[in-house]
Every structure is written in structure tokens, then in C-alpha cells.
Amino acid sequence: GNNDWAYYLLSQIFVIITFYFVWKFSNLVFEDKIFSLLSVLLLSGIYFYNFTTPEFNVNVSQLPFWALSVYFFWQGLHSNKKFYWILFGVVSAFGFLSKYLFIYLLLALLIFFILNIKKYSKFIKNYSFSILVSLIILIPHFIWLFENNFVTIFYGLNRSGVSDFNFINHIKNPIIFLSKQIVILIPFFIMIFVIIRKFKMRINVKDKKILFLLSVNLIPILLMLITSILTGAKIRTMWMTPFYLFLGTLFLLIFKNYIDLKKMKIFYRIFLFFFILSPMTYLGISLIDKTKRTDYPGKEISRLVQNKWDDNFSNEIKIVIGDEWYAGNLS
């Protein structure tokens, strides 16, 4: 329609907010604007943050809340100010409302907190309060969920194929899941490779920053893998959209002493390549492939059905029954 541009703009606004808070968080970690900028630029090498961003959907909508949750949680751990913990509770609730898979990040943060409970014993009260804030915000949704027979949960389960039990799925789907993640991250690793002088990985297990970033980046993916193994669920690629937001920060922190800033020209060339390739590819596919959902003639079909109805009936169409796509377009 004529207002489709608004959805594309909204998507980019969400992405910009996300990148801004990734940069803000990275600045707290590195206290160096160059490394903070690199943390964001590296994301251009990940499929989810370039090619798929024009389409505004639940995967894009949860991006800023994912970044904000990590940022405010870290600020809460750093200062223990109730203000940051309240904000964490608010944005994490909105993130969960964007998509239930947001729970994987919240579980990762909880696991990190529990594993370091002795160090953060003074933070328990404020962290618990942030959880209470989230639950209060989520109460109306939980009531709606109960009254509507958990329809959104069953929708997700059906999309993952959990209801179709097959033992081989417990092996096949996790392998497919891991394989796809490796392929998706290849451009990211290329960008990292060109600026690293030596591949010496030294992880200080006592470094709070590294432990936190390992938790934020790896635990959600590990939990997703475990879910696929235990349930045989087919993890759809787009479900992983927010999971890699802080991967650049993690790798830069691990290899910080071996980053060669003299190679930045090569890095910028690769960055520009992926930065330009993404919109050009998206534009090309949009012009060539007319079977995408964005090209679905919903208004024309709706108008045709309405005209047929008016020719045969005098009353209005009050209810349209069908799946969310066809019935949604028709209504």
C-alpha cells in the first residue's frame, strides 16, 4: 500500500536503536570508541542485521529490547542502582512480549547471576525487584493467554514441528541448526580474521566482562540447541535474529591485544562490500521475485470478495474465519 514505507522506516529505527545500545554497552566494556564502533560494524557481516532488516516483524521488534536488557542488566551489576534494575525489568518484559524466545536471554542472565551469586549477593534484592516489575507488566498478557487457551504457545510449537514426533528429528534438527549458524557467521568471521594479528585465545575466567559476554552470547544458543535435542524441534533460522548482537564485542574483547588497527582499510572495504551487497540483493530479489509476501495482492482479493458478497447479500461481513495470513489479509 501507499503507507508501506512506514514499516520499512520503523524497522530501520529499531535497528538503529539496537546498534546504538550495542555501541553504548561496548563502550562500557572497552572504554574505547574505536573498539566500540568495531563491535557494531562487525554486525554488518551477520545475515540478520543486514539482509533481513527491511522487513518489520517480531524478530526485528525484539532487537532493541534484547540490546537494552543486556545494557541495563550490566549497568545494574556495575552500580546496583534501582533505576537501572527497574529499566531492565521494563525492557525485558517488552522483549518477552515481542517474542517468547526472549526468555532464552533472560535465562542466560539468570544463570550468570546464580553462578556468581557470592560476588553479587548485595544485588539480589534489586534483581528480584526487577523480576517483579516484569511480572507485573506481563500479568495482563498472562490473563489473556489463559483466556485464549495458550494459542500463541501452540502456534510456536506447531511452527517448530514438536507435535510431529519422530526420533530422528532429535538428531537431524540440532545438526541442521548448528550447520546453519556456522554458515550464517562465515562473513562475520572473515571480518574478524582480517584485523587479528595472531590467533591466540586467552580467556581469563576471572574477568567479569568476558564471563558476562560468554554468558550472553553462548548460553542462549546452547539452550536453543538443548531444546532442539530434547524436543526434536526444528529451529527456524530467523528465530536466532537477536542472539548474535554482542558477538562482535565478545570476539574483540578476547582478541583485543591482537587486533591490528593498521588493517582497518581492508576491514572497511569488506564492511562496505557487505553493507552495499545486502540492500542491492534485497532490491534485486524484490524486483525479480513477485511471490514474496510483500507482493501478495491482499487488497485486490479483499475488494473482489467484498464485491461478490455485496452482489449476493445485504448484510455486512462481520467475521472472517481462516488462518492468520489469508483471513488476516481478507479482513
Enumerate the language-model features and the residues they cover.
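Membrane-interface transmembrane helices that cradle and orient dolichyl/undecaprenyl
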Residues: 28-30, 69-84, 255
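Membrane-interface alpha helices of multi-pass inner-membrane proteins
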Residues: 39, 84-100, 110-111, 133-136
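Short acidic/glycine- and proline-prone juxtamembrane loop motifs at membrane-interface regions
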Residues: 51-61
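Short periplasmic/luminal acceptor-recognition loop of GT-C membrane glycosyltransferases, typified by
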Residues: 103, 295, 299-331
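Hydrophobic/aromatic-rich transmembrane helices and adjacent perimembrane loops
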Residues: 211, 229-266
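Transmembrane-helix motifs of polytopic, lipid-linked glycan transferases
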Residues: 9-30, 68-72
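Signature aromatic-anchored transmembrane alpha helix within multi-pass, membrane-resident enzymes
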Residues: 257-287
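Transmembrane-lumen/periplasm boundary regions of multi-pass, lipid-linked membrane glycan transferases
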Residues: 94, 105-210, 220, 225-226, ...
